[in-house]
């Protein structure tokens, strides 16, 4: 109760600060226009526009070259910049409440695609200037792929794999059954993972209102805290442009029959359909956005299969029960005040109600591969929302203050004593300033707190169905150009955790990086960063069971940590009017006290089951190449491209280290548990649930009103999984997993196709085919992926 009161006081303090801010006023004006290439008049997309005395106000030009920037009143000098183009400056007087229109013509040297990001340092930077590896996904790709769940577009991103809803970046994590993500997931820079299990609810992400997705590869705990052990995915939501915008997308589709016709469990068509909408508008000094979506999905994984050979059956789930349904509504509201320069305040929100299923194990490897094994499917009815109050103040001398907060609530009704409710209260104060007197030293610092409260009998392993986890942190990051072309950055974070008022941990975290501009379009970088992850409530205290599979608590599990080092080079290029970046990086990640989900006989008077334990030290090293670009090489013809290849060598450094022993009945000798004894393939000591080779490409070709898109993904064979799944295959869990993996050991190649027609300035129609070859494939062992499916999509934007 003490923690709940503290959380309420903290939230009230945040709201109080916002109300104080609302009593003040600010003076702002607007500068807008278009940016063109002087040589041919083509619009320039992605150019950076910022005032020299406050880069944090910077914006980027849109695909048509248009831009709009809010500026404090008074005399302002504006810089227009794009790598490979000559910078231009403009000096003018900004007047309160007025609009100035200026068109700018930039001259070419070498022309490159420019992307403005914020995730790397928590302030806006051009992507070629950052010291870490990052991929940026545009809203155009999200729309073109008919994205209803962001995992489908993340799966197309180089270096990123979504393994049954769990994100992996460069092989930095395996599979942990939905608990304890090693990748931090953020919306507008704040975590959006559940407070009990550290899991991301992907359908909760507002896909209709994403400005861009930024993926940081490698440990990034200095800025984003626990869970950013191997990377970060940040979803940046958009705010209105000067002109109102309304967007509607509706779609319908059907799953094809599986290539193994005998595995089809449904009668009639297996359909899915949905609608997305968004309206954004500026009304005087108010910025307003409202959006949402609704979806129905029959699904391709059916209810548990009747199996007479088992001592238990599961006939309570029907075909209709497994269909997914959800509705979501979100809003962004911001007010820009009149009489105090740079002051704004607002509130964002997102509400969702859903019905979904989770299948842990398929029924068998042939006719039951699209059905669940008895007692291993969970139906969930969820209600969730978050509310984000915030206030921001940008000063005349380039300083900025931001106070952002989030109230996140999730209620999952799973039945079978597995239901859970969590409340998360979090807030971050962040200060940023460029210190001119210290040679333009950029300082980003702040404090952060998060309090998570869980109420669930699922976590009674603590001795109570109510559990709390608190996290407090302070951080600072410094960036400076030591010489004209060398950028140096360094950061520090102190993290404090407390679980149930019984145990606590204080941990320092460091990072550093260099970026050197070798030529006009060539940037060399290197970086080192530490990561740290405290165990979740679920990892310590979960206690449940299903289908002969039990899960045991482990209050003794310890935090895991990592460090990441990499060196890379980013090369801008131009081929005609096609602009792009090519990037190559080599990296190494080390993990200490790695947490894994291990199956054993943990208690002599109960069935065997899984438990989270620390398994020792491991290493992932590798190489990654990626290319992104877009442009118009000839008149009426446009190309956009995103592709890459990732090689990883994920290895256990202590394959014979005994991290635990089981606890058999009397008169039986305990088994020693190590990497070697719990793995199906110990050659080269490859870690479990990793792909060593991943290649991806997405290309969109547009000619006049017709567009064609092609996406392809390759995954090498997953060499190593938990050996116990093979052992159980011969006893209580006859799934055929061993035979399936022996038969399908050559890797997986998946193709997607799409065709679009721009019917008018408002309407566009598209036809999409995912898994075009109707390949039967599994990425996460014991879970089949979707058969071929067809979608018709209609969008309207005005």
Question: Predicted regions span which residues?
Answer:
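Gram-negative outer-membrane beta-barrel transporters
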Residues: 249, 586-590, 611-723
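Short acidic/polar hinge/loop motifs at secondary-structure boundaries
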Residues: 67-70, 190-217
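Short, acidic, small-residue-rich periplasmic hinge/interaction motif at the N-terminus
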Residues: 36-40, 47-52, 81-85, 95, ...
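Extracytoplasmic beta-strand/coil segments of soluble accessory domains associated
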Residues: 134, 151-190, 194
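Membrane-embedded beta-barrel scaffold of Gram-negative outer-membrane proteins
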Residues: 402-412, 451, 517, 525, ...
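Structural signature of Gram-negative outer-membrane beta-barrels, strongest in the C-terminal barrel
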Residues: 391, 440-442, 462-589, 698-700
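Flexible loop and strand-edge segments within Gram-negative outer membrane beta-barrel domains
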Residues: 297-330, 334-394, 400-401, 408-426
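N-terminal periplasmic accessory domains that precede
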Residues: 100-105, 150-153, 168-170, 183-186, ...
């Amino acid at each position: 109760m003490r923690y709940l009161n503290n959380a309420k006081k903290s939230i009230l303090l945040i709201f109080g600060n916002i109300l104080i801010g609302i009593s003040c006023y600010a003076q702002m004006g607007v500068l807008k226009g278009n940016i063109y290439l002087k040589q041919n008049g083509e619009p320039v997309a992605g150019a950076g526009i910022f005032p020299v005395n406050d880069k944090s106000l910077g914006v980027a030009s849109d695909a048509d070259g248009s831009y709009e920037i809010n500026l404090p009143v008074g005399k302002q000098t504006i810089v227009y910049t794009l790598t490979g183009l000559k910078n231009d400056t403009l000096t003018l007087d900004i007047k309160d409440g007025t609009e100035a229109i200026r068109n700018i013509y930039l001259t070419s040297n070498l022309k490159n695609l420019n992307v403005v990001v914020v995730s790397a340092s928590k302030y806006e930077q051009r992507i070629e200037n950052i010291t870490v590896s990052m991929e940026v996904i545009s809203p155009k790709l999200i729309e073109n792929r008919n994205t209803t769940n962001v995992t489908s577009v993340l799966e197309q991103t180089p270096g990123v794999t979504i393994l049954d809803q769990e994100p992996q970046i460069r092989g930095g994590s395996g599979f942990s059954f939905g608990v304890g993500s090693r990748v931090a997931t953020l919306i507008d820079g704040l975590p959006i993972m559940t407070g009990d299990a550290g899991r991301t609810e992907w359908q909760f992400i507002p896909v209709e209102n994403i400005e861009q997705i930024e993926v940081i590869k490698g440990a990034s705990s200095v800025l984003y805290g626990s869970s950013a052990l191997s990377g970060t995915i940040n979803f940046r939501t958009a705010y209105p442009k000067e002109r109102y915008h309304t967007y509607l997308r509706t779609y319908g589709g059907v799953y094809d029959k599986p290539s193994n016709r005998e595995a089809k469990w449904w009668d009639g068509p297996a359909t899915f359909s949905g609608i997305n909408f968004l309206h954004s508008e500026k009304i005087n000094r108010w910025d307003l956005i409202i959006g949402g979506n609704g979806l129905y999905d029959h699904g391709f994984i059916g209810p548990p299969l009747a199996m007479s050979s088992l001592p238990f059956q599961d006939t309570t789930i029907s075909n209709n029960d497994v269909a997914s349904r959800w509705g979501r509504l979100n809003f962004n509201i911001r007010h820009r005040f009149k009489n105090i320069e740079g002051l704004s305040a607002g509130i964002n929100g997102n509400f969702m109600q859903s019905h979904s299923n989770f299948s842990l194990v398929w029924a068998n490897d042939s006719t039951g591969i699209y059905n669940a094994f008895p007692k291993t499917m969970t139906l969930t009815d969820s209600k969730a929302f978050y509310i984000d109050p915030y206030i921001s103040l940008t000063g005349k001398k380039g300083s900025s203050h931001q106070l952002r907060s989030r109230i996140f609530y999730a209620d999952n009704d799973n039945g079978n004593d597995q239901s859970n409710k969590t409340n998360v209260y979090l807030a971050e104060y962040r200060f940023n300033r460029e210190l001119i007197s210290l040679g333009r030293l950029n300082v980003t610092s702040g404090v952060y707190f998060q309090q998570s409260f869980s109420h669930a009998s699922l976590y009674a392993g603590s001795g109570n169905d109510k559990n709390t986890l608190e996290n407090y942190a302070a951080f600072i990051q410094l960036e400076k150009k030591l010489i004209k072309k060398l950028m140096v950055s360094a950061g520090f974070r102190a993290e404090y955790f407390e679980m149930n008022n019984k145990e606590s941990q204080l941990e320092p975290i460091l990072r550093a990086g260099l970026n050197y501009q070798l030529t006009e379009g060539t940037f060399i970088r290197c970086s080192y960063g530490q990561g740290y992850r405290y165990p979740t409530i679920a990892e310590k205290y979960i206690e449940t069971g299903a289908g002969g599979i039990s899960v045991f608590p482990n209050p003794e599990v310890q935090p895991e940590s990592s460090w990441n080092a990499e060196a890379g080079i980013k090369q801008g290029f131009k081929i005609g009017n096609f602009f792009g970046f090519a990037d190559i990086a080599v990296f190494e990640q080390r993990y200490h006290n790695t947490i894994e989900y291990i199956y054993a006989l943990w208690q002599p008077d109960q069935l065997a089951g899984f438990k989270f334990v620390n398994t020792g030290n491991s290493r992932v090293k590798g190489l990654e190449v990626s290319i992104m670009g877009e442009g118009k090489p000839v008149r009426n013809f446009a190309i956009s491209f995103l592709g890459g290849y990732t090689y990883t060598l994920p290895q256990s450094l202590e394959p014979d280290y005994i991290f635990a022993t089981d606890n058999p009945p009397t008169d039986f000798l305990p088994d020693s548990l190590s990497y070697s004894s719990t793995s199906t393939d110990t050659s080269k000591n490859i870690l479990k649930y990793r792909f060593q080779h991943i290649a991806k490409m997405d290309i969109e070709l547009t000619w006049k009103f017709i567009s064609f898109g092609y996406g392809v993904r390759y995954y090498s064979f997953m060499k190593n999984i938990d050996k116990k799944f093979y052992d159980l295959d011969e006893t209580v869990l006859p799934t055929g997993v061993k035979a399936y993996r022996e038969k399908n050991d050559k890797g997986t190649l998946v193709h997607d196709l799409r065709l679009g027609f721009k019917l008018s300035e408002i309407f566009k129609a598209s036809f999409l085919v995912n898994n075009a070859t109707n390949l039967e494939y599994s990425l996460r062992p014991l879970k089949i992926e979707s058969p071929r499916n067809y979608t018709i999509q209609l969008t309207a934007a005005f």
